Amino acid sequence: MPTISDDIDETTARERSLARLTVGFIPLVDCAPLVVAKEKGFAAAEDLSLELVRETSWANIRDRVMVGHFDAAHMLGPMPIASTLGIGHAETPMIAPFSFGLGGNAITFSASVYAEMEAAGARPAMGPAEMGQALAKVVSSRRDGGDPALTLAVVHPFSGHNYELRYWLAVAQIDPDQEVRIVVLPPSSMVAALRDRQIDGFCVGEPWNSLAVEAGAGVIAVTKSSLWRQGPEKVLGFRADFAQRWPERLSALLRALYKAAEWAGRKENHPELGRILAAPDYLAAPAEIIGRALSGNLVRGSGGAPELVPDFLVFHDHAANFPWQSHSLWFYSQMVRWGQAPYSPALAEKARQVYRPDLYRGALARTGIDLPRASAKVEGALKVATPVASRNGAMILGPDGFFDGRLFDPDQLEAYLKSFGVQIADGAK
């Protein structure tokens, strides 16, 4: 007759037989699919044992993937592109075969700066264009009065945060390189820096915006989803040679994360997900605060009422986990726009190939799930939820608009860059 000891021995033997993967993450709500894959057994069901290692900065994440400390990592969407192109660090080919979701960031200002914006006409219900106009008046007033320029923090130079902040400022006719000061801080340092007046605002993922509000230090002015509805954010990053050495492990991890993201995206699971993420090993933050991001019911300022933000953070719906190559090329376009990278068709192609929909499709081919037919799309073209071509004919994408109405056609990259005044040399290769 089996005993409890026999059951324990069998479980231990099973754990020893699992392929072990070490994966780094930053404590943000959008790391949820990784945590769920481990805690809810989706990884074990794919014969994987996940060791999740919490890091404090994105630079550490990148470096530890580069040198092989991590097999993979929760990574900023532009980061594997920059590493592959050798921009800002040693050239290390990387791939991104999975997206952790869409949205999840916000731009928060100190209470005192937001008061200046209110005096310039800002109101909580305003869209990003009008909010930007109020900020432009504050920037102009400070300049005319001889006051220091605003200091705004982002999490890394090669981040969606940096690019969406710059995009918003530029639409408001604020020069991000001349009229404000943009600095880099780890996400976990943002709230203290804002409270201590070392910075005037930041763009970061949750729960840090809501924690700033809860501390009375900040006011959420703009969300990523209002700047680019269903815009890309974090990816699963690997060194390119991992896929060559361990293709089955990579595919197994993609399947586990797909199922975990599907679970995390269900509203009925959000209370449990909030409790899981709140644990000291993960976000070490109150479950109630985490729940704001999960539900999209954000409190913008201290004492304010919750406000539902559509598509604030999307874990699974709308092909949120698919690594669209148009996302990769948009990130590259911003590197070029802001002087981080030169433009050439060869570099654009290299950037495009960092995102790997072929590996995503291959991992999920036998599951029967619906998959997009295309690997890239015109970003910003869908004004409403729209059926698109897919394997099972049941996929809905969008809306995915940019707040200024622009479109990004990945096949017209040069024209897109020129529309921002970027000079491209004739015959760039």
Locate predicted features.
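Ligand-binding pocket segment of bilobal, Venus flytrap-like solute-binding proteins
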Residues: 71, 180, 184-220, 239, ...
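Secondary-structure end/capping motifs
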Residues: 248-361
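Internal, well-ordered alpha-helical segments in soluble enzyme and binding-protein domains
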Residues: 161-164, 186, 190, 204, ...
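Solvent-exposed alpha-helix faces
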Residues: 70, 199, 258-262
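Extended ligand-binding regions for polar small-molecule ligands
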Residues: 41-44, 111-129, 233-287
